Amino acid sequence: MDEKLICLQLGALLHDIGKIIRRAGLDSKEHSKAGSNYLKNNNLLADRYKEIYDMIYYHHAKYLSSADLKEDSLAYIVYEADNIASGIDRVKYEDKQIRGNEMDSLNSIFNVIRIEKNNLKKTFKLFDFDKNGFNMPTSSSIKLNNSDYKKIINHIKDNLNTFKENINPEKLAIVLEACCSYFPSSSYVDTPDISYYDHVKLTAAISACFYLYDKENNIQNFKEEYFFTINRSKEKFLLVSGEFSGIQNFIYTI
């Protein structure tokens, strides 16, 4: 079991938790500070995975550039993974006062990908943890509020306290999928149709790929690799696809 890899994946999954804190009205600081402070103040993950605090606090360039971190800090990996998962260069946005409405609901992707006759704009309501339900987008105007996000952060905190030493990325991902799949990751984009969960899950996957590649190739200076001299032409990823057509007849006999 690679404890550093587990810590990295947990940190990547939680790197944007400050957005939920802000939207819940619990802290007005920038989300990187709000998230790190929340975990510290509630003594969450402090025993084994305290480095997660740095991954949350320093995942944007303006704080990371002046951070007193070791060259092998996992915060550098999360920083670059977050940039790639976002599909943008975060540096262009960090020093600008670009703010959307943090209470906007998640847009349906079919608001953009649609047939000619479909001009309805649909959004999702916040899912209420009903395991037997299915959350369909609606054309009704939906605005989320502080209490919606308070329920979410309390659900996450309760689970983190329950897991304690037995936490792992898979358990945390299940919790986040249940409560974070139906509100947007970013509030400053034109079309908020990427969910919070999808963004942090992708950030964690990219972080894990970086770490495993670097471990195999004996790369230990993450500060140089992911902050000072970023080289995105390195082939660190392998996308695997499979073809399962033709097995329907077998499936129907089960």
Residue ranges and their predicted role:
Residues 1-144, 150-151, 181-189, 252-254:
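Divalent metal-dependent catalytic cores for phosphoryl transfer on phosphate-bearing substrates
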Residues 141-249:
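Low-complexity, highly charged intrinsically disordered N-terminal segments
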